[in-house]
Amino acid sequence: WNKFVDEHVMNYVSMHGWHRMVGIIARSIEGGEFEQLLENIPLPDQRKKWATARSGWSEADLAAATDKIVYALEKVEKQLGETAWLAGNAYTLADINFYSHCGMMVERMFPELEVAAKYPRLVDWRERVTARPAVAEALKSEDRTAPGLRTWSGHVR
């Protein structure tokens, strides 16, 4: 499950977040300054993401990413019909990983997917994860993210 979340779910959710939020930031930086900033990013994949965020992903790429997210939601819904938690009958890192990358905010990021109507087991699972004492405590913490970078709100500024 963790490999699936890390290599599948996170990439496609991230693409939408970068397109919606980071793209606005990247496009607001003047051309020469942006190129200079790119040179300072040590990881080639991150440089490519910033450059792509500036130009934007194609509608076809975004639609394909959404299809992959739907696949993930269907896979999770099916699994939760068989076991109480993602990796079996015990709460594990798989639950924490999926919750933090997709499960917690998927409805806010993708309202068009009608998560509550189509994935009731996932919604129940999310509520059970959210109610866990450590998760509830973490969610009460102050959000220290700069307001302009809060990608889960659906707004950049």
Predicted regions and their residues:
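GST-like fold's C-terminal all-alpha helical module
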Residues: 7-127
